[in-house]
Amino acid sequence: EVENLLGRHVGVSRLEGNEADLDVLQQLVTKGVLAKDDVRDWQAVGVVFGDILANELGLAWVSYEDERGVSKALRWRKTMNFVFPITLFSKRNQFNQSIDMHAIYAKLVKDVEAFRAPFHLR
């Protein structure tokens, strides 16, 4: 879905799956390609963003279950440290928060570094 939108609106036919894709995803936001209420497309962007996090930071997609149900999340190793990228942008949009792909990515990198700190890994 996202690659189709990127092809039509940004002129990019393929994503790399790494940090370089953040500029391309930001163009979707900046150009207003996604409708504010289009939760599905915003969540698709979250999946692509999550794939970038997984590839760059060594996280793995898992099913996370709590009292509210099951959702997909990224986990670092077999710890209880999770990131929930799928709903990240749809929720920000819902609450009228700005979306800066690089700033969000940088914050999550710091969060993951904090996960790793007790293990003395970077």
Label each PLM-derived region with a short phrase.
Residues 9, 29-32, 56-57, 92-96:
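Generic structural signal for hydrophobic core residues of well-folded globular domains
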Residues 26, 50-51, 102-104:
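Residue-level signal for functionally critical sites in structured catalytic/ligand-binding pockets
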Residues 32-78:
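Amphipathic, interaction-prone secondary-structure segments
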